């Protein structure tokens, strides 16, 4: 319907707007991953857990730069154990402060406040939320009681638009350094490979008996393969192989029917 098409388009618009702020464009003619400073904990190193207190919800925003300031002041490293879009509840560990045996409650409270929780997911740092909404629409359209491949194809069109933006960009480094180049924060950005899979796998599963859906997914992935950074090639090729197998299996089942 026109209303559903409008919803699909609006989700796509909002998702493309959000990804600009999260995923940097790769340098022109440079498909080599950029390596900055890294960090890993020394075995047995002291650390203090940061637990959610009297709250619950989806992680809507992680202020990595403000966490860098806190970590530098403590002369520590803060690892963030949750990702944008992930649910966290009271008592759950959301971060650790490494290199300290104790941390003042005021600093723990500050760290907790820099990992924002909301009543529902938001697109601010959570591009996966936009894709999740679109995939859910396609899954409902492909359910046996509805069987609306046209709407599913409209969703794939919008996912194509989003993924075409993503496959020419880089997943941000999980390591965030202070001005002196020392890693102070380690977080978990949503990986672009995972977002590609999110936008394809479930639709391919629920649309496995729809030639239109499988054909549109194949068309999309083939186009993405031609423009994507080389680092995403294996993910795209793997998905193309899965869809080819799904189509062959569906054709075989159809042939076996009396």
Regions found by a protein language model. Give the residues of each.
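Short basic (Lys/Arg) and small-residue
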Residues: 1-79, 83, 92-258
């Amino acid at each position: 319907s026109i209303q559903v098409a409008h919803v699909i388009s609006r989700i796509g618009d909002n998702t493309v707007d959000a990804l600009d702020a999260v995923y940097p464009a790769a340098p022109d003619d440079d498909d080599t991953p950029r390596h900055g400073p890294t960090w890993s904990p020394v075995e047995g190193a002291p650390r203090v857990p940061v637990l959610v207190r009297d709250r619950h919800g989806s992680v809507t925003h992680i202020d990595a730069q403000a966490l860098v300031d806190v970590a530098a002041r403590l002369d520590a490293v803060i690892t963030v154990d949750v990702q944008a879009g992930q649910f966290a509840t009271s008592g759950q560990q959301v971060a650790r402060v490494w290199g300290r045996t104790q941390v003042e409650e005021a600093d723990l409270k500050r760290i907790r406040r820099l990992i924002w929780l909301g009543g529902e997911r938001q697109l601010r740092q959570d591009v996966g939320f936009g894709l999740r909404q679109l995939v859910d629409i396609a899954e409902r359209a492909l359910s046996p009681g509805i069987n609306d491949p046209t709407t599913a194809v409209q969703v794939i069109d919008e996912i194509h638009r989003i993924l075409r933006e993503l496959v020419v960009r880089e997943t941000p480094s999980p390591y965030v350094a202070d001005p002196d180049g020392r890693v102070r924060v380690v977080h978990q950005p949503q990986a672009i490979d995972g977002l590609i899979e999110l936008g394809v796998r479930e639709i391919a599963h629920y649309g496995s008996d729809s030639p239109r859906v499988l054909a549109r997914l194949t068309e999309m992935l083939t186009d993405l393969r031609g423009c994507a950074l080389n680092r995403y090639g294996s993910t795209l090729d793997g998905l193309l192989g899965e869809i080819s197998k799904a189509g062959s299996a569906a054709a075989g089942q159809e042939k076996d029917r009396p």
